[in-house]
Amino acid sequence: MSDINAIRAPILMLAILPCVGDDIEVLR
């Protein structure tokens, strides 16, 4: 399980970061 999480974690971060960046720009 740890190996799968190690692979998923970076992918989830890359998938979430753009969404968070858009939200921050909208708040500005």
From Swiss-Prot:
Keywords: Toxin. There is a cross-link at I11-P18 (Cyclopeptide (Ile-Pro)). Processed by the macrocyclase-peptidase enzyme POPB to yield a toxic cyclic octapeptide. POPB first removes 10 residues from the N-terminus. Conformational trapping of the remaining peptide forces the enzyme to release this intermediate rather than proceed to macrocyclization. The enzyme rebinds the remaining peptide in a different conformation and catalyzes macrocyclization of the N-terminal 8 residues. Transmembrane segments: none annotated. The keyword Zinc-finger does not apply. Residues 1-10, 19-28 form a propeptide. Belongs to the MSDIN fungal toxin family. This is MSDIN-like toxin proprotein 8.
